[in-house]
């Protein structure tokens, strides 16, 4: 497996999804969203932008999560968590991903501080795709929140 550089603050956020068909989901995250496979099999690790998507066939419980069963969303219209992808140009991404087969719920819609739209992956996981439109907003990495509590106590 290729190695991503270690995160500067010692942490990186990875999104873990459960799929009924790991290969189908791999194709979606690589061919439609443009990620690249870093580890094949089950799970599949896909590098996407500056993070990882881990695609797993589900299962459980396991010794470290003895009461947890991993499964796909039973109802894709009832969501408690979703992936949020921030982009520089939402209209360009919408056109590109639509051409690659992404099925958006709606075209991008303007909201007070962002323009956004949503897609679902093949298992029904919701994905927000958005662009900040706040003229005062700076979403560059220099303005991301710190990932360590130690800095707050200094």
Label the model's feature ranges.
Residues 1-13, 36-85, 92-120, 132-154:
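Vicinal oxygen chelate
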Residues 16-22:
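Conserved beta-strand-loop-alpha-helix junction that forms the acyl-donor binding cleft
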Residues 19, 84-87:
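Short, solvent-exposed loop/helix junctions and linker helices
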Residues 24-25, 89, 93:
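Short phosphate-engaging motifs
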Residues 25-30, 97, 121-124:
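Conserved active-site tyrosine of GNAT-family acetyltransferases
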Residues 128-129:
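Short glycine-/small-residue motifs
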């Amino acid at each position: 497996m290729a190695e991503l550089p270690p995160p500067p603050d010692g942490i990186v956020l990875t999104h873990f999804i459960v799929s009924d068909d790991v290969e189908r989901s791999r194709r979606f995250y690589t061919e439609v969203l443009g990620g690249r496979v870093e580890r094949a099999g089950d799970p599949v690790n896909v590098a996407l932008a500056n993070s990882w998507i881990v695609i797993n066939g589900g299962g459980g419980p396991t010794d470290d999560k003895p009461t947890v069963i991993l499964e796909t969303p039973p109802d894709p219209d009832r969501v408690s968590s979703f992936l949020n992808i921030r982009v520089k140009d939402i209209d360009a991404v919408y056109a590109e991903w639509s051409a690659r087969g992404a099925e958006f719920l709606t075209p991008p819609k303007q909201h007070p501080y962002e323009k956004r739209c949503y897609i679902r992956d093949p298992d029904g996981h919701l994905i927000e795709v958005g662009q900040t439109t706040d003229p005062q907003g700076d979403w560059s990495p220099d303005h991301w929140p710190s990932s360590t509590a130690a800095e707050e106590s200094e």
